[in-house]
């Protein structure tokens, strides 16, 4: 007869397949294939990984099942598929003694410390020097009896070259740096002069006063606007977007490259474009006084922000002014320095800007009334010197001009999505799910503990809550938590709405120079008027899911890359400020410490031993409430709380900064 203990043991020894995420310290977690969230992840101890690396697909034997108090743990029994076959790192030569003892000429300090500590090289590539950054192909994975080996396939850069640190990250993240000769040849073959054939069947807006509004340094100008009042006192908003699809045709080398990249990547010292510069900064960029092919969305909007009518069509424009956010803000704000000069310099659009601001305010009110959830966000720009060293972090809040352009682009994106939806034509949508259930439940509890009402994740409830906490001592903490309950927006062939915008229909139409989904939208806008047969619709229904999935993945890769480089440069900046004192805001808590963000947007960690409360009492971590509290006193650390810190360490390579708390007096 089978004993209950034996049965339980047998049930515990179940196998599961999934993806291994490795921590730099060696342990990790397997995310099962059929799991929907991280609560089902299986912990793998350092000695139970079977030398699996980050991202490997593995089979795991569950040795301890999940309980109410702790997650499951197990042992990796098989590596089914390797995630990494090539990588990048820094070359280090070995001493003669080491060469003789180990049989290798050099080792590689890998960029990704989640793969493995050290990779050995039998024969370095000709020309490789100490501390060069190199690309590698893995030739042997580590086991109990085998060493981790690789072969150098190329030199990315030599020690001391400006920008090499950023280039290493781009290569590690597999962000392509060069275009193929075929792709470049296709781009160069286009004439700079528009022909009669190019202009055929296009609306002519060359006599319309149109202008672009972008950052001071922007070169890929893919959107222009015109705004005016009509005789019935309604507004006419024209959003004119570079017609990239005219040049990047389906099946071309340009198209294949654009699909592969799916997005431009914007990092501290450079832009890695989706398209060759001949297109991104020239033929498709709506440069001042240049005739450019566009796709236009003209909207008639009433004084409540409602669209009365619209027209979407291929077009041609001639940009009147290349405006910057700074100059437009000077035109808008009477008391701002340079206001009078800006009005004089850009006199042709003075009336249009006034009307644009009026329309923007109407649209903002309309979106707030329907429930759009908006957070005040600041951007930080890291200023580098000529050697690529960070010398300043400039924080910039979004002013009227920035919000106005965003408002108009949102309007165009919604209108184009509505057009596809009304005509029941296959398309791509930008969708955003409701808040994450578990995170939102924690927020509701935190709100209740602070004496505020948040009883659902409806737009009305969230906006009421946001207004209720405004100006209170809890605003920072609860707003930060609210922001982190939000899901990530993705691309989809299904129109499942956009929660954050409170929009029933939404797509990406306005940036085809830097986003592949927008290019697809333009392609479909060209296609459907002449061919909306069932065959064509069926073909696109089949193709769009893969385009959506790939575009979302590449967007995620770009975002992660940008964050890594941002963190690296901020750590480098703070490495010269060891010992300096700042006031920061607590942004997260874990049992090992507290994350703190400074006003300059640098984020660092105060480890528990460096939490100086001013007393000798011990702190305990309440995981459910996500707070640290004193065991005896009322000392509490929670998200949103201000805290005075001192910088004690910074690691550029890892992109980390360490703080210690300065004890309250």
UniProtKB/Swiss-Prot annotation:
Keywords: Cytoplasm, Exonuclease, Hydrolase, Nuclease, RNA-binding
Top-rank taxon, per record: Bacteria
S1 motif domain span: 579-662
Listed EC numbers: 3.1.13.1
InterPro entries: CSD (IPR011129), CSD2 (IPR040476), NA-bd_OB-fold (IPR012340), RNase_B_OB_dom (IPR013223), RNase_II/R (IPR001900), RNase_II/R_CS (IPR022966), RNase_II/RNase_R (IPR004476), RNase_R (IPR011805)
Entry function: 3'-5' exoribonuclease that releases 5'-nucleoside monophosphates and is involved in maturation of structured RNAs.
Protein name, UniProt field: Ribonuclease R 2
Organism: Lactococcus lactis subsp. lactis (strain IL1403)
């Amino acid at each position: 007869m089978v004993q209950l203990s034996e049965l339980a043991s047998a049930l515990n020894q179940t196998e599961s397949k999934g993806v291994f995420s490795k921590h730099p310290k060696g342990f990790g977690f397997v995310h099962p294939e059929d799991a929907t969230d991280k609560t089902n992840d299986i912990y793998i101890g350092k000695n139970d990984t079977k030398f699996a690396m980050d991202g490997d697909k593995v089979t795991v034997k569950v040795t301890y099942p999940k309980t109410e108090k702790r997650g499951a743990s197990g042992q990796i029994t098989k590596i089914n598929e390797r995630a990494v076959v090539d990588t990048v790192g820094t070359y280090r030569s070995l001493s003669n003694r080491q060469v003789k003892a180990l049989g290798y000429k050099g080792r590689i300090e890998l960029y990704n410390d989640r793969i493995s500590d050290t990779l050995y090289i039998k024969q370095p590539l000709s020309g490789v020097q100490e501390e060069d950054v190199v690309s590698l192909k893995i030739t042997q994975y580590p086991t109990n009896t085998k060493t981790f080996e690789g072969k150098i396939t190329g030199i990315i850069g030599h020690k001391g070259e400006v920008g090499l640190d950023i280039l290493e990250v781009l290569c590690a993240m597999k962000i392509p740096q060069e275009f193929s000769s075929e792709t470049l040849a296709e781009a160069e073959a286009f004439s700079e002069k528009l022909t009669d054939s190019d202009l055929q069947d296009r609306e002519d807006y060359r006599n319309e006063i149109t202008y672009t509004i972008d950052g001071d340094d922007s070169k890929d100008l893919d959107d222009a606007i015109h705004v005016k009042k009509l005789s019935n006192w309604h507004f006419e908003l024209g959003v004119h977007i570079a017609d990239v699809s005219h040049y990047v045709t389906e099946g071309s080398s340009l198209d294949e490259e654009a699909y592969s990249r799916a997005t431009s990547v914007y990092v501290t010292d450079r832009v890695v474009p989706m398209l060759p510069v001949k297109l991104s900064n020239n033929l498709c960029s709506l440069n001042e006084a240049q005739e450019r092919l566009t796709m236009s969305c003209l909207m008639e909007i009433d004084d409540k922000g409602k669209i009365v009518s619209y027209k979407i069509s291929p077009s041609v424009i001639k940009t009147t002014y290349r405006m910057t956010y700074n100059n437009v803000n000077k035109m808008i704000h009477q008391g701002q320095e340079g206001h009078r000069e800006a009005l004089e310099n850009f006199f042709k659009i003075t009336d249009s800007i006034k009307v644009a601001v009026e329309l923007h305010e109407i649209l903002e009110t309309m979106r707030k009334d329907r429930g759009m959830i908006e957070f005040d966000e600041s951007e930080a720009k890291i200023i580098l010197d000529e050697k690529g060293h960070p010398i300043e972090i400039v924080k910039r809040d979004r002013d009227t001009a920035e919000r106005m352009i965003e408002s108009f682009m949102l309007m165009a994106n919604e209108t184009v999505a509505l057009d596809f939806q009304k005509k029941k034509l296959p398309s791509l949508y930008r969708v955003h799910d409701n808040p994450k259930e578990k995170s939102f439940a924690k927020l509701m509890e935190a709100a209740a503990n602070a004496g505020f009402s948040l009883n659902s994740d409806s737009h009305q409830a969230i906006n009421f809550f946001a207004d209720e906490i405004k100006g209170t001592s809890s605003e920072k903490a609860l707003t930060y938590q609210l922001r982190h309950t939000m899901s990530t927006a993705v691309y989809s062939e299904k129109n499942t709405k956009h929660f954050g915008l409170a929009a029933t229909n939404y797509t990406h139409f306005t940036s085809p120079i830097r986003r592949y989904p927008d290019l697809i939208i333009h392609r479909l806008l060209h296609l459907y008027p002449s061919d909306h047969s069932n065959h064509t619709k069926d073909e696109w229904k089949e193709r769009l899911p893969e385009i959506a999935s790939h575009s979302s993945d590449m967007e995620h890769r770009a975002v992660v890359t940008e964050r890594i480089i941002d963190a690296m440069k901020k750590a480098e900046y703070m490495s010269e400020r060891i010992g300096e004192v700042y006031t920061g805001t607590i942004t997260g808590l874990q049992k090992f410490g507290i994350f703190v963000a400074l006003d300059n947007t640098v984020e660092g960690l105060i480890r528990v031993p460096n939490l100086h409360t001013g007393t000798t009492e011990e702190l305990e971590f309440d995981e459910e409430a996500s707070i640290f509290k004193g065991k005896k006193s009322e000392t509490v650390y929670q998200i949103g709380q201000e805290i005075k810190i001192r910088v004690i360490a910074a690691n550029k390579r890892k992109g980390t900064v360490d703080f210690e708390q300065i004890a309250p007096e």
